[in-house]
From Swiss-Prot:
It comes from Mycolicibacterium smegmatis (strain ATCC 700084 / mc(2)155). Part of the 50S ribosomal subunit. GO terms for molecular function: rRNA binding; structural constituent of ribosome. GO terms for cellular component: cytosolic large ribosomal subunit. PROSITE patterns: RIBOSOMAL_L6_1. Keywords: Ribonucleoprotein, Ribosomal protein, RNA-binding, rRNA-binding. This is Large ribosomal subunit protein uL6. The gene is rplF.
């Protein structure tokens, strides 16, 4: 039995869960999220209101989807109650970010500013010209947008310049030695 998959997902008060076959809908104070659960996995409610994820057999595919489905459901519940935030920072001379309406405009050493538009359900916040955050209720969407932004100017291994996640340690390389 999957150690993660066998644990029930607790549903806090104020969160409404609707199970319709393989489709799961979670509605909370921050919004609504839906998930299509993969075929061999079944989802049901326990007496105490928690969500229970079960698998029909011990095939490799069922075992791998068991823990995944449970974690995705737990992420939905956390998303509609607390939400997700990814803090990011920019290092480099002249590198900065500013909020333009709901979008982010970056100056990252290119000959032009780079504009990142906020997709539906994602909000940006700028704390300083070098620190900003990406927030939303969908963990996958927050992570994807954060990765797209980081890819604009990856951290340089020699000088450490670029966009990185807050607290991320960049592995530095030693430059060429002069004679």
């Amino acid at each position: 039995m999957s150690r993660i998959g066998k644990q029930p997902v607790p549903v806090p008060s104020g969160v409404d869960v609707t199970i319709n076959g393989q489709n799961l809908s979670v509605k909370g104070p921050k919004g609504t999220l839906t998930l299509d659960v993969a075929e061999p996995i079944s989802v049901s409610r326990a007496e105490d209101g928690a969500i229970v994820v079960t698998r029909p057999d011990d095939e490799r595919r069922s075992r791998s989807l068991h823990g995944l489905s449970r974690t995705l459901i737990a992420n939905l519940v956390t998303g509609v109650t607390e939400g997700y935030t990814q803090k990011m920072e920019i290092f480099g001379v002249g590198y900065r970010v500013q909020l333009k309406g709901q979008n982010l405009e970056f100056a990252l050493g290119y000959s032009h500013p780079v504009l990142i538009e906020a997709p539906e359900g994602i909000t940006f916040a700028v704390e300083s010209p070098t620190k900003f955050s990406v927030s939303g209720i969908d963990k996958q969407k927050v992570g994807q947008i954060s990765a797209v932004i980081r890819r604009l100017r990856r951290p340089d291994p020699y000088k450490g310049k670029g966009v990185r996640y807050e607290g991320e340690q960049i592995r530095r390389k030693v430059g060429k030695t002069g004679k």
